[in-house]
Every structure is written in C-alpha cells, then in structure tokens.
C-alpha cells in the first residue's frame, strides 16, 4: 500500500469472486463520517433536484452517502476549497473531499423483506434447487408466493418437511388444526416467499449432508448417482469457500457508485440517465411501500403481493429478463441490468478488463511484402514515428538536435529528413510484435524487425501468413512495441518469426510455401517443349557462370524458359538415369570429356574434375542462384 498526494494504490496478488454475506454488503455501503455519523443507506428514489440540479439527500445520488459532486465543496456551499479537506459540513452533512470518490463509494438498500438472488435461483443449474433437493418449478412456486412450504410438520400425520401446499390445502389444514375436537398439540409451521426459502437454507447442515451423500453415492448407479454427485459438488464448494447457503437470499442490496450510472444533462435541458437508476428507483419505491404496509398492519394478501413485486424488481435489477416479463423503458427498449453490464462481448470483463486499449500500439491493413526477409515486416513511417516517439525524442535531445521535449515534438510534426534518420537509428534492432485477431494459438503474436516503408499498410512476409491465418483481402493486424529491455530480449529470442518454424500443436512445419510461391517456383523451373536444345559450345547459349546467365536474362538476351549450357562445378541432380556416359572423348591435352545427356564433364589426367557444363533453363539458373545467394548470406 503506498500513499502519496492523496493517491492510493493497491497491489493485489489475485481477485476472488464469491457470494457476499449480508454483513459484507452492509460493510461495502456503510461508512462512518469523521463526525461519527453513520451513512450509506439509500432510502429515497429521487435522483437530482430539477430546480437546483443538485443531488437529493438520501437519494440515489446523495452527496452525504457517495461524496461531493464538485471537488472540495459541500452540498450547501458553506465549505469550498481544498483547505477544508476532511471537514463534515454541520448544515448538510457532506464530507469535503474530491469528487472522484463518487466512482468507488457504494451505498446499500435495506430490504423490508428478504428476496431471492435470481442468479442462484434461475441459473443453470439452479444452486438453490440442487441444495434443497427440490425441483426448480417448486422452488419458484415458493419464492413467487404461489405455494406454501412445510417448514415443520408438527404432529400432523399427513404433512412432511418441505412439502408444498396450495392456498386451499393450507386453509383446510388450518381448519383441521383449530377445530374444537383437534388432537394436534404441536402445530405445523408453513412459510411462503423468500423468507421460507431462507429458513430452509438455514436449516441445512452442509457437513452432515455431505457425509450422508458420500455414503449414498457408493450404493447408487446411473442417473441417481449423477444427481448425487452434482449435489455434493455444490455442497463441497460452499464448504470450501466458507459461504452459507442462506446468503443466496438477500436482506440488503448494494447500490453501485453514482459515477458508474451517471445522469447527464442534454442540450435541450432534458436528462439522459443510466438504466440502472430506473431499476434502482423501482426497487426503492416498492421497498418503501412494503415497509409502510407492514407498519400499518395491512392485510396479508396486500403485503404478500407487495413482497412479490419487490422480488420481481430486484430480479430485474440483477438480471432483467431472466424471469418473467422484461422491464422496458422508452421506445419499448429492455432496460440494461447489472448482468447485462458484466456479461458478453461488450461487457465489463471482455471489453474493459481483458480487452483494454494499450499504449504504444496501433493497427493497420496488411499487404504482402515479398522482398522482406522472414523476420522483417514493413512498418509505415507515419505509424513508426508515433509508436517510437519517446525513443525519438530522447535521441533528439541526447544528440543536441533540440533542447527540450516541446521542441522535439514540433520537429517530429514536420517529419523532415533529420527526424527520419533518428527514427531509422531507433528502430534498428528494436523488435515489434504483430498480432492478428483472433489469437487462437501462440503463433498469433510474433516478433519482427521493422523496416520503414511508405504508404499506410503494414507489409508482411507471405511465409508467416499460415501461422497468423492471414490473407491479404483486407485483414488488419495490431502492432505493439515492447518497451523494457527484458521484453525486447524475450521478443527477439522467443517470438521472432524465423524462430517459429514448427507448429506448437502438431510439431509439423507451419512455415510452408503456398499459392503464388508454389506457382512461381513451378513456372520458373518448368520445361517448355517447344524450345530447342542448343548444341554444346554454341557461343550464344553457353555461359561461364550463373552470374553471366543472370546478366544476359536481365539484358533481355535470354527468355525465362530458354535452354542454355552453363558452367557449374557443384553437385548436380539431373534426369540422367544412365550409369555411364553416352560417350567419352580423349582430348589433346590429356584430359577426358564425358558426354552425358544433360551435362559435359571434363576430367584431368589425375581424374579430378576440371569443368562441368550443365544443360538447363534460364529459370532454373535464377532459382538456384537465388537459393545459393540467400544461403551464403545467412
């Protein structure tokens, strides 16, 4: 924990998500002000006063609970400026502090009746139903006030624990219990709604049930065994996390910070507000109405109806549309609940936590760069100057080209030759990472040495395309710059494209030529039947080296598929299937000329090879020369 200039940083080893106890929910929202006053409970559905445009006290934007809406200024305006820091205004009760506390300070709503948490009730699987070993349909009947559940059968012979009773059935049993000739001394006890559910969950002894289930599993088979395993798995999770089953029924609900569900004034004087405020308002209205009905001892049927409506309001707040009718706002649009904010591609986790925008990164369309080496990529100058700006500024100042950062930035905006020269020096040996979404395996991100190119597209070597599953029909790739020296070293050693030849999944080469490369290689080395094979010794078609052939081809004296004789003293794999030459000539100087179908070999008297001329095509010479040249440079 470090504290400097009122900025507090927390360093975490891990984040654990688990079910919260009622006390934990209260602790999130409840605070004791420096004057000893306890605040945190939201009791009013109002948001802001439409005349003063200030938050209403004890409402959803209350400054006493969540902090001031303006930095260092209380609600009534008595205290302004930072010198009053930490003071609680005697008039309005608002603590004088920064307004950004409204991004993390929470409140809570104390519920007049317990409500079931819709995630645990209607989730798949339903944890409440599994724990109680009651079908989900029956649990819903209890929670939404359609059926009573027997909590204690008493002396009644026909009743069993956890048995469901309709309204009419319970009235009949009541008549039986309170009849004059009744023999029942220990009266049965029934419940309805989330209160009954809470009672059932409180009665569970998880350790004892776990032991009984383990014994039962050994003697059971098939579907029954699978059901028991499912139940024991849930129970073991509750035991391992020290969570109590009754926490799945809420006594209080947290109110998230107001700056995470803002209310914004539009140009016409109207207000745009987060859907959560409407959902919270429904909960508070129904909760206050229920508390009032209980206070005036309203008839049970009215109270029960209000409890059901409160349950539905909390369901809509947590997960709108999970059960019953979806709550809609203007234009019949479904209101966005807490679950909608968290889940899915646009949710908090995938959009904001896992998919954060990062500094020193960019993206652009990829095009083929056939002249690049495999470990290189073409980076547009416009992109490079932006990504490597801090390095360029540092070098400009170090080389005394400019005196300060401001001057360096002005010079960079001009993008003159001096800046480009410095940029070239900076990117020399500084690898960058290229990523193509979706990154399905580790080769989806690879390191390359950047080469400055014109235009706005990233140039990519065609051989690395299979690893990225990329093609050049408009695909985009992201660029990331490793900043630390360790990151650069790791990128160069482990992630460089030329070090990732094999697929990590199969172990087979993933860098394989395809399409244009295969077609080009075939065309280059193909033999055209309509070209005549020249006589050996013809000055126009006999060359002393591969280089001479290349020069003649570049001068357009030769076509690509023309037959030629070329001197090449290396090993030759030709199509001659003969074991001995067609003809052997003894020459005047004592040397020997062997005439094969596609080559002429001349040997000295000591049987050493003096020269070898090979009959081939210009295209094959180009192919061989390119490969030999590339291999000799590495």
From Swiss-Prot:
The keyword Cell cycle does not apply. In cyanobacteria the RNAP catalytic core is composed of 2 alpha, 1 beta, 1 beta', 1 gamma and 1 omega subunit. When a sigma factor is associated with the core the holoenzyme is formed, which can initiate transcription. Keywords: DNA-directed RNA polymerase, Magnesium, Metal-binding, Nucleotidyltransferase, Transcription, Transferase, Zinc. Signal peptide: none annotated. Its EC number is 2.7.7.6. The gene is rpoC1. This is DNA-directed RNA polymerase subunit gamma. One of its GO terms (biological process) is DNA-templated transcription. GO terms for cellular component: DNA-directed RNA polymerase complex. It catalyses: RNA(n) + a ribonucleoside 5'-triphosphate = RNA(n+1) + diphosphate. It is an enzyme of class 2 (transferase). Zn(2+) binds at residues 74, 76, 89, 92. DNA-dependent RNA polymerase catalyzes the transcription of DNA into RNA using the four ribonucleoside triphosphates as substrates. Binds 1 Mg(2+) ion per subunit. Binds 1 Zn(2+) ion per subunit. Mg(2+) binds at residues 471, 473, 475. GO terms for molecular function: DNA binding; DNA-directed RNA polymerase activity; magnesium ion binding; zinc ion binding. Belongs to the RNA polymerase beta' chain family. RpoC1 subfamily. Its cofactor is Mg(2+); Zn(2+). It holds the Pfam family RNA_pol_Rpb1_3.
